[in-house]
């Protein structure tokens, strides 16, 4: 189980790299997602967006930006 962080250093989720299960906790709510290889999820907290991608059977990658930076990236 590994923690993944946003650009501000806050924990966004925990992921089990072996199984592909991702656990996202926010306040009193817990969401569990199974991610196959080459899939992504977007996690938004206030003005921060983090995209978690399962790149291989045993690894994930994250990209995290301020919401306005993300919108400029999507529109380009």
Task: Write out the residue ranges for each language-model feature.
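N-terminal acidic leader/helix
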Residues: 1-30, 55, 63
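Short, solvent-exposed S/T- and G/P-enriched segments that are highly enriched in secreted/extracellular
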Residues: 27-39
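Mixed-charge, Lys/Arg-enriched low-complexity segments
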Residues: 36-76
């Amino acid at each position: 189980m590994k923690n993944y962080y946003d650009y501000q250093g806050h924990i966004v989720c925990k992921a089990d790299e072996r199984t592909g299960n991702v656990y996202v906790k926010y306040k009193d709510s817990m969401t569990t997602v199974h991610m196959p290889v080459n899939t992504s999820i977007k996690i938004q907290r206030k003005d921060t967006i983090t995209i978690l991608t399962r790149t291989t059977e045993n690894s994930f990658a994250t990209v995290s930006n301020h919401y306005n930076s993300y919108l400029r990236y999507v529109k380009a």
